[in-house]
């Protein structure tokens, strides 16, 4: 499927970068928060629904040929809270696609962190932390749609299929490693499940996404 704009570019434009949000919890997955998240879609919206279990609230994402993300403007001090923590699960993955190509650039689950680096939204830099269906943990590559975003595998269904897994990464160090940037603050965060290229059905869950000092 040919895209006029990349998914990454559309997600980056979610943010106006105005107010300071003094919090380290990225998403609470409450109804109030859900109703106020900014939505950007490529063609058809991914189905997002709220739920809860013994560990708290979660967001369920279902896509079959759809692609839309949920994002918010949030200022994170990476000198104080550089670690991003994500608890997530992929119930139905996208086995067999080439995630590094334009035709296969779909992910069952992904979390974007965004840094404003220029005068326009499309000049911003992003790291796209992904729950891969085919690649190994620790692998990374530039998005086939924009050099401003790098995909970085934090989890894979090759080792964690249909089970909750919690991952942690140092975002400040990741920006230096992947973009060669010394970043003190983040400006936005977004989540997305998309299958608009592969048209395969995917189901994933997001829970307890937050930044921490250690």
Annotated model-derived regions:
Residues 29, 189, 207-211:
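Extracellular beta-strand elements of beta-rich domains used
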Residues 49-69:
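Short carbohydrate-recognition loop motifs
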Residues 104-149:
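Extracellular/luminal beta-rich ligand-recognition
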Residues 5-15:
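Sec-dependent N-terminal signal peptides
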Residues 21-42:
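Extracellular carbohydrate-recognition regions
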Residues 106-111, 147-148, 153-157, 161-201:
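Extracellular beta-strand ligand-recognition surfaces/modules
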Residues 73-84, 158-161, 182:
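Extracellular/lumenal carbohydrate-interaction signature centered on repeated Trp-anchored short motifs
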Residues 87-93, 116-118, 172:
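Solvent-exposed strand-to-loop "edge" motifs in beta-rich extracellular domains
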């Amino acid at each position: 499927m040919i895209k006029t704009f990349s998914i990454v570019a559309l997600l980056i434009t979610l943010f106006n970068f105005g107010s300071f949000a003094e919090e380290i919890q990225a998403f609470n997955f409450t109804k109030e928060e859900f109703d106020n998240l900014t939505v950007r879609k490529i063609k058809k919206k991914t189905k997002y629904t709220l739920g809860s279990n013994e560990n708290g609230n979660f967001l369920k994402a279902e896509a079959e040929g759809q692609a839309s993300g949920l994002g918010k403007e949030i200022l994170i001090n990476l000198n104080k809270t550089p670690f991003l923590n994500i608890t997530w699960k992929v119930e139905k993955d996208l086995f067999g696609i080439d995630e590094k190509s334009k035709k296969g650039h779909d992910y069952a689950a992904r979390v974007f962190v965004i840094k404003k680096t220029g005068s326009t939204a499309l000049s911003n830099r992003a790291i796209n932390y992904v729950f891969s269906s085919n690649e190994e943990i620790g692998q990374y590559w530039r998005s086939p749609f924009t050099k401003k975003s790098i995909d970085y595998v934090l989890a894979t269904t090759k080792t964690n299929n249909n089970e909750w897994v919690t991952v942690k990464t140092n975002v400040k160090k990741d920006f230096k490693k992947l973009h060669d940037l010394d970043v003190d603050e983040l400006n936005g965060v977004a989540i997305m499940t998309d299958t608009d290229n592969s048209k395969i059905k995917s189901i994933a869950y997001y829970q307890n996404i937050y930044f921490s000092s250690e």
